[in-house]
Amino acid sequence: MNYFFESMKLRMVTWWQIPVICYCRPQIIHLDDEYCTLRIPLNWRTRNHVRSMYIGVFTVGADLTGGLLTLTTIHKRKRKVVLIFKDFHANFFKRAEEDVIFICRDGAAIDQAVQ
């Protein structure tokens, strides 16, 4: 499935409400009830002086994958819930010197929490 329109919708919403996410230009690769995958390109916007990705961009990607899964679940259940993150945990395995793929596979746990 092509997620071009979902990526464009994400850019439109974030441009207005959360501009820093829009600035990073995330692209949705896969989004369903179980997991979310997105890519953030390494370019002049996201690259630091040592030609690797800023840690803040890593945080945006990690936060956004879980957030998209949660928003999808909330929307599907037609719940009126405001999404506020208390904290999150992410593992960064090495320095990013190219585009980065972010994956969240916690769809079942998120579904359980939204109930």
Task: Annotate each language-model stretch with its function.
Residues Y23-M53:
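Catalytic strand-loop segment that frames the active site of acyl-thioester-processing enzymes
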Residues M8-W15, R39-R45, I74-F85:
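Short, charged, low-hydrophobicity "junction" segments
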Residues W44-G67, R79:
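Hot-dog-fold acyl-thioester-processing enzymes
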Residues P19-P26, L83-D87:
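A short, amphipathic edge element
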Residues M1-Y23, R45, H49:
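Alpha-helical membrane-targeting segments
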Residues L69-D111:
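Hydrophobic beta-strand-centered segment that forms part of the acyl-chain substrate-binding groove
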